[in-house]
Amino acid sequence: MAESDGSNNENGNLDTVTQKLDRGVAAIKPQYLTTKEKFHVFIDADGKEVVDKQTCSELSGNDAENTVRAEDAAEPEAKRIKLDDGTGEGQDKPPTSAENKQEKKRARGQNKSRPHMKHSQFEENKLCPSVTQECASKCFFGDKCKFLHDVAKYVSEKPEDIRPNCYLYETFGKCIYGVTCRFAKSHLGDNFKNLINEELMKQWEGQVLVKNSLDKSLKEQLRKRKVVFEKTDKYLKLCNKSGDSLKIKSPVVKEDNAAQVVQKDSPVTTVGAVTDEDLVKLRPCEKKTIDFRNKLYLAPLTTCGNLPFRRLCKRFGADITCGEMAMCTNLLQGQPSEWALLKRHHSEDIFGVQLEGAFPDTMTKCAELLNRTIDVDFVDINVGCPIDLVYKKGGGCGLMNRTNKFEQIVKGMNSVLDVPLTVKIRTGVQEKINIAHKLIPNLRDWGVSLVTLHGRSREQRYTKLADWEYIAQCADIASPLPLFGNGDIISYEDANRALQTGVSGIMLARGALLKPWLFTEIKEQRHWDISSTERFDILKDFTNYGLEHWGSDCQGVEKTRRFMLEWLSFLCRYIPIGLLEHVPQKINERPPYYMGRDYMETLMASQNVTDWIKISEMLLGPVPPNFSFLPKHKANSYK
């Protein structure tokens, strides 16, 4: 009996271990599963079957002491052993809890202080803009110009063209990058003259494809602080006069002498119902309104939510798009890199910008500035950003604990905007203390047009699933104010369950990064078993959109490559429908090592940076000799 009990216990323990190992791992059909070594051998051999064990060990790099793959370097030692063979064999001494904590801390979060290539690293000799733009006049700097003026010399030293056809020339009839274009042979004539297709150019004449660019004169005014903020100044004066903007109320006046009564605090002298104000504040009913209900909202994704990616999502069925988070202080300083985040493609019919800030004066000024300088349909306040840099300054999630400042920001921005004001929040700051339900009624009273709730707290991040029960509770409290839910939606079934909670719509973030065709799946109510060829075509489209947006010269090509690599760090986590044992894929389950149905599908499943670069080289040519890339997100749970 004792022996029997012992063996049962042993079997039970083994089952428990197996269960623990399988937890959090996606279930893939057995015929596609493989080992880590075989997976990388297959990739390194360009899809050729390697039968010889000796060759296999050579290709896999048996002397791991000298060569360590990028993904292994980021993985804690204890976890690597556990994931590779599921046992702790080979460990002379089990790691202490302190060592485990240290390893986990090192592998989580983001890669901060990442190296970025400078513009000067893209090419040694840069051609002078006066030559590139074929200016009639000579270079303004003359002999002191640091750039190259000899076109023949530039062409002889320039890297080989990536491919024979230029997307910009074939689409618009002219490539503005001329001889510097990495596809220049298709539009260069005699003496390196840039060719123009007049008929094709006429088709685009008068069309504005990208809006919201920063004007040079406005940039100078912002840098010299010459921009006047009339509406903001009036709002702030009103705040200062009352001592507390939250207690400002209009006096109750009897109808018979209403025309004769003047508010004591009013800065404007009135005569009856007429004032001498040049700009009269719009009433809520006169503001532009948007019907947000039952729409698919692409989240404002930092780094990855760029204009080319939004164009792709728009094509797949996204209804609402929003620019990446922009810092209000940087916008007020006229920083071109920050203003670039506000650009809008003409295909984005419902488009907003997201602002981050911690103080009423800067946020209200920024809202007033954008209201009169750019074309947007709504402005969103980021009250969900969890990063320390923002939180410690009182912005992002920090505003959820600073309700007085939060109210002043919302009321101030609402007073200067002609478009709806929306807010994105989290469930709370601390993991088990939800406070969103307390804020939502206030947001409704302050004049917010839409609230988007991410079903996680700041401290929780992505360690647990989004709390959709709490989102449902908040949606009920918010009514009639529209509330969108956000979190863990990666299939149309997830979307249907989310909509059953009573939310007005859903926001897609990581799900859209893993599979941008998710919008199509939701609208057509189907699982799309997309092929690797179709996925590669999506990357081709992103490449073309990137070259159009960032440029087809060396700098533009490398910018496009960089953002493609950032996106590939998410795309590689997608598991094709045909390989799954249970459809759909769960967003919190990491993919095991598997062989795809063809080489490209297998290559796209690799979480090794080297393989992402290989994909980028198929579209953008070889990387420069000094190229380096470190992914922004370590994504430890998926390695």
Swiss-Prot record:
<feature type="region of interest" description="Disordered">
    <location>
        <begin position="52"/>
        <end position="122"/>
    </location>
</feature>
<dbReference type="InterPro" id="IPR013785">
    <property type="entry name" value="Aldolase_TIM"/>
</dbReference>
<dbReference type="GO" id="GO:0008270">
    <property type="term" value="F:zinc ion binding"/>
</dbReference>
<feature type="zinc finger region" description="C3H1-type 2">
    <location>
        <begin position="160"/>
        <end position="190"/>
    </location>
</feature>
<dbReference type="GO" id="GO:0106414">
    <property type="term" value="F:mRNA dihydrouridine synthase activity"/>
</dbReference>
<feature type="region of interest" description="Disordered">
    <location>
        <begin position="1"/>
        <end position="20"/>
    </location>
</feature>
<dbReference type="InterPro" id="IPR018517">
    <property type="entry name" value="tRNA_hU_synthase_CS"/>
</dbReference>
<dbReference type="Pfam" id="PF01207">
    <property type="entry name" value="Dus"/>
</dbReference>
<feature type="compositionally biased region" description="Polar residues">
    <location>
        <begin position="1"/>
        <end position="19"/>
    </location>
</feature>
<feature type="compositionally biased region" description="Basic residues">
    <location>
        <begin position="103"/>
        <end position="119"/>
    </location>
</feature>
<keyword id="KW-0521">NADP</keyword>
<feature type="binding site">
    <location>
        <begin position="300"/>
        <end position="302"/>
    </location>
    <ligand>
        <name>FMN</name>
    </ligand>
</feature>
<feature type="binding site">
    <location>
        <position position="354"/>
    </location>
    <ligand>
        <name>FMN</name>
    </ligand>
</feature>
<feature type="binding site">
    <location>
        <position position="424"/>
    </location>
    <ligand>
        <name>FMN</name>
    </ligand>
</feature>
<dbReference type="GO" id="GO:0006417">
    <property type="term" value="P:regulation of translation"/>
</dbReference>
<keyword id="KW-0863">Zinc-finger</keyword>
<feature type="binding site">
    <location>
        <position position="454"/>
    </location>
    <ligand>
        <name>FMN</name>
    </ligand>
</feature>
<feature type="compositionally biased region" description="Polar residues">
    <location>
        <begin position="54"/>
        <end position="65"/>
    </location>
</feature>
<keyword id="KW-0677">Repeat</keyword>
<dbReference type="InterPro" id="IPR000571">
    <property type="entry name" value="Znf_CCCH"/>
</dbReference>
<keyword id="KW-0819">tRNA processing</keyword>
<feature type="zinc finger region" description="C3H1-type 1">
    <location>
        <begin position="122"/>
        <end position="152"/>
    </location>
</feature>
<dbReference type="InterPro" id="IPR035587">
    <property type="entry name" value="DUS-like_FMN-bd"/>
</dbReference>
<keyword id="KW-0862">Zinc</keyword>
<feature type="binding site">
    <location>
        <begin position="509"/>
        <end position="510"/>
    </location>
    <ligand>
        <name>FMN</name>
    </ligand>
</feature>
<dbReference type="GO" id="GO:0006397">
    <property type="term" value="P:mRNA processing"/>
</dbReference>
<feature type="binding site">
    <location>
        <begin position="486"/>
        <end position="488"/>
    </location>
    <ligand>
        <name>FMN</name>
    </ligand>
</feature>
<dbReference type="GO" id="GO:0002943">
    <property type="term" value="P:tRNA dihydrouridine synthesis"/>
</dbReference>
<keyword id="KW-0288">FMN</keyword>
<dbReference type="GO" id="GO:0050660">
    <property type="term" value="F:flavin adenine dinucleotide binding"/>
</dbReference>
<protein>
    <recommendedName>
        <fullName>tRNA-dihydrouridine(47) synthase [NAD(P)(+)]-like</fullName>
        <ecNumber>1.3.1.89</ecNumber>
        <ecNumber>1.3.1.-</ecNumber>
    </recommendedName>
</protein>
<dbReference type="GO" id="GO:0102265">
    <property type="term" value="F:tRNA-dihydrouridine47 synthase activity"/>
</dbReference>
<keyword id="KW-0507">mRNA processing</keyword>
<feature type="compositionally biased region" description="Basic and acidic residues">
    <location>
        <begin position="66"/>
        <end position="85"/>
    </location>
</feature>
<feature type="active site" description="Proton donor">
    <location>
        <position position="385"/>
    </location>
</feature>
<keyword id="KW-0479">Metal-binding</keyword>
<comment type="similarity">
    <text>Belongs to the Dus family. Dus3 subfamily.</text>
</comment>
<comment type="function">
    <text>Catalyzes the synthesis of dihydrouridine, a modified base, in various RNAs, such as tRNAs, mRNAs and some long non-coding RNAs (lncRNAs). Mainly modifies the uridine in position 47 (U47) in the D-loop of most cytoplasmic tRNAs. Also able to mediate the formation of dihydrouridine in some mRNAs, thereby regulating their translation.</text>
</comment>
<keyword id="KW-0520">NAD</keyword>
<keyword id="KW-0560">Oxidoreductase</keyword>
<keyword id="KW-0285">Flavoprotein</keyword>
